[in-house]
């Protein structure tokens, strides 16, 4: 039986990786390069369209626990992330082009994979084939209409991406390398601002022209990817407690903490490109250039990619899917990735691993399995398939139901999660 996967993003490639390694015939439908969404540029698989960071690796962090669980389950995304990483303190950041190339090469190395570079418009749900919808949050066109009819409509939210600038256009005489509180390996470039410089920047930011979006609703902005200009609307000091917070950073030229800081993170290993951390925006492009050049050290910044906003689409999973991320009516149709309501690169990839595991069991005529809810991934999947009012969700400590205080959870939860995941893997074998 052939397994058809629609979409070769982070979720789709994890499903494929799990199946291909066991000899299952896989057919991947990927519309790139014939058709690109508004945020996709690279024809390779596993393209990162927002930040190049896969968040923290620390086991005192929910994202770090999720990565550790995925490593137990043999994640292709993490395998390539480690191979293509760039310095980013405690975060796992990657050279996005090398990362996508790595994933693509791994998938195409199998003889039992067929890749069809075409846009899918609908699915014939005949019972002799399995289908996986992993089309991501930018699902659109005729397929989106077909899927909407199948699932009873979509839920939506908006998020934005940050600009990327050329490394050789940064004036390093006005910036300094450091990580907060002196932790890490000083991988971030910090652009310090005085009170006067910040006030000028803030005034220009809130008065800058924005690109209008159809049906835009500020209440539908995803909290992690809010445009910087929307955060600024909350008050003049809102950025000082958000993306421009200076805490934990000392300017070596003054020996003092600056009034505000804008951080830059490497996009590639050689430092040819940097992204502005927390600077997601939907300002008009000439306005982005003008305002970025108000930042000390970036007066001559060359923008390689401008920030943009896009609408993200996901299905109402509790109504549509069972606990295995399978359609409640069509037993040969699975879903994976952000289309299910998870949020984040790692979270999306993790759902693909889970779906791959259960498709293998389906093919072997075994009972499908749910993950223990005392794993980070299991708790996340439980949320998106049972929530009474689904909102996009990323890995966090609140999902895992254990009787611990906040401090104890941060220190000990990883032991419980990883032990449960190892037991799950042993049960599979």
Swiss-Prot record:
Pfam family, one: GIDA
One CC-aspect GO term: cytosol
Cofactors required: FAD
Reactions catalysed: uridine(54) in tRNA + (6R)-5,10-methylene-5,6,7,8-tetrahydrofolate + NADH + H(+) = 5-methyluridine(54) in tRNA + (6S)-5,6,7,8-tetrahydrofolate + NAD(+); uridine(54) in tRNA + (6R)-5,10-methylene-5,6,7,8-tetrahydrofolate + NADPH + H(+) = 5-methyluridine(54) in tRNA + (6S)-5,6,7,8-tetrahydrofolate + NADP(+)
Originating organism: Thermosipho melanesiensis (strain DSM 12029 / CIP 104789 / BI429)
Subcellular location: Cytoplasm
One function term, GO molecular function aspect: tRNA (uracil(54)-C5)-methyltransferase activity, 5,10-methylenetetrahydrofolate-dependent
Keyword entries, A-Z: Cytoplasm, FAD, Flavoprotein, Methyltransferase, NAD, NADP, Transferase, tRNA processing
Protein name: Methylenetetrahydrofolate--tRNA-(uracil-5-)-methyltransferase TrmFO
EC class (word): transferase
UniProt family annotation: Belongs to the MnmG family. TrmFO subfamily.
């Amino acid at each position: 039986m052939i397994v058809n996967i629609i979409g070769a993003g982070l979720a789709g490639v994890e499903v494929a990786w799990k199946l291909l390694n066991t000899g299952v015939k896989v057919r991947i439908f990927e519309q790139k390069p014939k058709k690109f969404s508004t945020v996709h540029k690279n024809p390779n698989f596993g393209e990162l369209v927002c930040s190049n960071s896969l968040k923290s690796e620390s086991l005192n962090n929910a994202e770090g626990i999720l990565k550790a669980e995925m490593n137990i389950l043999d994640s292709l995304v993490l395998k390539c992330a480690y191979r293509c990483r760039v310095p980013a303190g405690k975060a796992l950041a990657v050279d996005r082009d090398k990362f996508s190339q790595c994933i693509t090469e791994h998938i195409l190395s199998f003889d039992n994979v067929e890749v069809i570079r075409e846009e899918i418009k609908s699915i014939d749900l005949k019972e002799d084939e399995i289908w996986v919808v992993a089309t991501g949050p930018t699902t659109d066109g005729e397929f989106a209409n077909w899927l909407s009819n199948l699932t009873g409509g979509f839920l939506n939210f908006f998020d934005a991406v940050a600009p990327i600038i050329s490394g050789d256009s940064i004036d390093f005489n006005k910036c300094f390398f450091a990580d907060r509180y002196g932790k890490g390996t000083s991988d971030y470039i910090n652009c310090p601002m005085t009170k006067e410089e910040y006030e000028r920047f803030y005034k220009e930011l809130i008065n800058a022209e924005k690109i209008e979006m159809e049906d835009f609703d500020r209440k539908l902005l995803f909290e992690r990817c809010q445009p910087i200009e929307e955060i600024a609307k909350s008050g003049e000091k809102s950025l000082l407690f958000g993306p421009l917070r200076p805490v934990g950073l000392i300017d070596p030229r003054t020996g003092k903490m600056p009034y505000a800081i804008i951080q830059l993170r490497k996009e590639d290993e050689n430092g040819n490109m940097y992204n502005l951390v927390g600077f997601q925006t939907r300002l008009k492009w000439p306005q982005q250039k003008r305002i970025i050049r108000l930042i000390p050290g970036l007066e001559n910044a060359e923008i390689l990619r401008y920030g943009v906003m896009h609408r993200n689409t996901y299905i109402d999973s509790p109504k549509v899917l069972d606990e295995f991320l399978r359609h409640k009516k069509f037993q040969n149709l699975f879903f994976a990735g952000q289309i299910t309501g998870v949020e984040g690169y790692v979270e999306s990839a993790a759902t693909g691993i889970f779906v791959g595991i259960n498709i293998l069991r389906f093919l072997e005529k075994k009972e499908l399995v749910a993950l223990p809810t005392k794993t980070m991934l299991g708790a996340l999947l439980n949320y998106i398939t049972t929530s009474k009012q689904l909102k996009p969700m990323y890995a966090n400590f609140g999902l895992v139901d254990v009787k611990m205080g906040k401090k104890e959870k941060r220190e000990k939860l990883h032991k419980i999660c990883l032990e449960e995941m190892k037991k799950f893997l042993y049960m599979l074998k």
